[in-house]
Amino acid sequence: MSEYLFTSESVSEGHPDKVADQVSDAILDAILAQDPKARVAAETLVNTGLCVLAGEITTTAQVDYIKVARETIKRIGYNSSELGFDANGCAVGVYYDQQSPDIAQGVNEGEGIDLNQGAGDQGLMFGYACDETPTLMPFAIYYSHRLMQRQSELRKDGRLPWLRPDAKAQLTVVYDSETGKVKRIDTVVLSTQHDPSVGYEELKNAVIEQIIKPVLPSELLTDETKYLINPTGRFVIGGPQGDCGLTGRKIIVDTYGGAAPHGGGAFSGKDPSKVDRSAAYACRYVAKNIVAAGLATQCQIQVSYAIGVAEPTSISIDTFGTGKISEEKLITLVREHFDLRPKGIVQMLDLLRPIYSKSAAYGHFGREEPEFTWERTDKAAALRAAAGL
């Protein structure tokens, strides 16, 4: 019986790029809490002893950006110079400009050529769902995130006190070529920053027994499963001291782990007038509802936009041969049941709220948090009825 391998990865909240994402989204949330109509593109760079805040912000909100950045870094766990990055001691520089009026006139209702609220930029966005996990996410990315959440949990509650904030996980999964179903887990890679006091064998055993095995389905772990734990043998220096971190550098971790294409636009630090974020969320909402409705077991949707124009320039759907109805019919149903204009997306998913900080680590999709409206399956019944199933 033929098989194939597929791999996805996740990173912890202490990974330098994720530190940057979380600072950017914390600043976005602080602004939206006061000014829901603000225009925000908040970028962050973190390096040894340094946090740089830059981008374009147009708002009436009064926010202490430096305080928000320090509080976010501290919450992640970088609160001591021993860790190489200290929330209280690092320098924080603020370099925000305002949004270009040329862009603003294309987004503001009643301005520009299209008087509706237009897209904040051109671009293409994808959404995906499949039936491999309870939250309709691909297996490898779903469980990579769960491993990283488990590492954070054991670090923060003191059960493994020698853990430090930076970590990465990677899963290689074996699929049956005929059924497309997960057969077993081939390789688990988990690298975690740690105190210098802990020995390698103690660390390796604790990671396997207390992080990996409680998270991964035991029936998919076999005698052949390979465990690669801190494969270099040492990971003391990490976080922003080990690598420079930037907002928007973990876009595959943020989405589907490579199981679906990506349009290239990052999410964190962007208000929902930016279709890079809001339309990608809407695409996930569409794909998840199609799979939840039983119209397909796999669904990928692409939408595209032109700057300043409200209506999508294209909508396409691929169900990879699993659809119960044609893809043309699915597109018709999507147009009837989902408003994919920028303003429609914001209203449909209630996006003008300070809900984004939680999304900045452990994935934007496949987490049934109350704030994550794009994970609801409230359109599934109507889609199924309209499809005549």
Swiss-Prot record:
* Domain of life per record: Bacteria
State the organism of origin. Answer: Neisseria meningitidis serogroup A / serotype 4A (strain DSM 15465 / Z2491)
| Textual note on the cofactor | Binds 2 divalent ions per subunit.
Recorded GO molecular functions are:
ATP binding; magnesium ion binding; methionine adenosyltransferase activity
The reaction(s) catalysed by this protein are: L-methionine + ATP + H2O = S-adenosyl-L-methionine + phosphate + diphosphate
Q: Pfam families given for it? A: S-AdoMet_synt_C, S-AdoMet_synt_M, S-AdoMet_synt_N
- Give the EC class as a word: transferase
The record's function comment reads:
Catalyzes the formation of S-adenosylmethionine (AdoMet) from methionine and ATP. The overall synthetic reaction is composed of two sequential steps, AdoMet formation and the subsequent tripolyphosphate hydrolysis which occurs prior to release of AdoMet from the enzyme.
Q: Which InterPro entries match?
A: ADOMET_SYNTHASE_CS, S-AdoMet_synt_C, S-AdoMet_synt_central, S-AdoMet_synt_N, S-AdoMet_synthetase, S-AdoMet_synthetase_sfam
Q: Could you give a single Gene Ontology term from the biological process aspect?
A: one-carbon metabolic process
List cofactor names only.
Mg(2+); K(+)
Question: Which amino acid positions bind Mg(2+), per UniProt?
Answer: D17
* Residue sites binding K(+) per the record: E43
Annotated region described as Flexible loop, given as residue ranges: 99-109
Q: What is its main location?
A: cytoplasm
Task: State which pathway it belongs to.
Answer: Amino-acid biosynthesis; S-adenosyl-L-methionine biosynthesis; S-adenosyl-L-methionine from L-methionine: step 1/1
- Residues that, per the record, bind ATP: H15, D166, A167, K168, R234, F235, D243, R249, K250, A266, K270
| UniProt record similarity statement | Belongs to the AdoMet synthase family.
Note whether Nucleotide-binding occurs among the keywords: yes
Residues the record lists as binding L-methionine: E56, Q99, D243, K274
- UniProt-listed Enzyme Commission number(s): 2.5.1.6
The record's subcellular locations are: Cytoplasm
GO CC annotations, alphabetized: cytoplasm
Name the record gives this protein: S-adenosylmethionine synthase
